[in-house]
Amino acid sequence: MIPIISIEGSTDIAFTENVQKRFEAFGFQTIDVADGNDLEAIGKAIEEAKADQTRPSLITVHTQIGYGCPAKQGKASAHGEPLGVENVAALRENLKWPLEESFAVPEEVFAYYAQYAA
């Protein structure tokens, strides 16, 4: 795993260390999840990590900065610039999020967390 985007832009001129290999050298179990939007793969990685009780685990999850926002996806500007109204609308549309509300929590998410609040 080598991070490729920072707040300043691409990291390839200043950072080339493979962090996952470093942790392997320390004796960690390392598990790689190629798609940070694949919740099933993340769940499997967690179960795999929990199954190995002999050593610590590092789960590397690859994500794309600004995912879903056409003007920011894969760009360093996703770190520190406001999206703006048009980009928020495009993001909501891409992620199939309600367009009418400025802030919304899906009922199933609210219900899940409500069970722990009591």
State each model region's role.
Residues 1-116:
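Glycine-rich ThDP/TPP pyrophosphate-binding loop and its adjacent helix/strand module
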